[in-house]
């Protein structure tokens, strides 16, 4: 039985994107494919091994809702990798990855001496990932601290209990989180808590979506249907909350941050990629926007 109930759909798709990008030479995540295999979704495992998502000539070339999202996830992963390296060069030694899922940055990236990476997610997600990585004899590249808690609960207190110091600058990562996964009030509370725990000089990298519109909802349905045609029953709609969301860069600008907005074209360009053939259709409607920000 597949373990998506344990690790979540977004974590699974993120691992799939990293596995594809690793085979293409765009990333170096040797753990993405084994983790995906451990989740146990046969279609994804076979598709990656067969290079199904690797080119416009592939069987999903007529479905940009699939390929465009995988490209976007891979591009943002690479962008965040570089964001964290830059934060390390600037002297930041405290990193928090919110809803870390199957991310393996504490194992696969270069880190300056003395860096601690805090990974926050539900305990069962962290336990699943740790078990698979132990079986792979994966070696940590820096100090890692797993914080098993739901982000709707008091995660700042949980961070403090394991040594997080809000007086020191932090590099924050929020991937596939500010995209409707939380209800509007929950997202606002998370951003308030993050801001309160951020000393001057802290940095944030996130993807985000403004309030979902009818075109995006239709694109989401097309995305889910694309997976179902290939035997993968993912109810992405169950992870999406409707409501009026603050535009994240504007929210940050009014709460003590200096934000810089970025587009998917910026991120794909950093990988030497352009849009997939057909990506201008409705399938790209729910590709997120991107922001980095510095606490002042």
Curated annotation (Swiss-Prot):
UniProt cross-references to PANTHER family, sorted A to Z: S-ADENOSYL-L-METHIONINE-DEPENDENT METHYLTRANSFERASE YKTD-RELATED (PTHR43619), S-ADENOSYL-L-METHIONINE-DEPENDENT METHYLTRANSFERASES SUPERFAMILY PROTEIN (PTHR43619:SF2)
GO terms, biological process: methylation
Protein name (Swiss-Prot/TrEMBL): Putative S-adenosyl-L-methionine-dependent methyltransferase MAP_3881
Pfam families, A to Z: LCM
Stated role: Exhibits S-adenosyl-L-methionine-dependent methyltransferase activity.
Domain of life assignment: Bacteria
Protein family (similarity comment): Belongs to the UPF0677 family.
Any one GO MF annotation of this record: methyltransferase activity
Gene3D superfamilies: Vaccinia Virus protein VP39 (3.40.50.150)
Keyword annotations of the record: Methyltransferase, S-adenosyl-L-methionine, Transferase
EC number: 2.1.1.-
Positions with a binding annotation for S-adenosyl-L-methionine: 121, 150-151
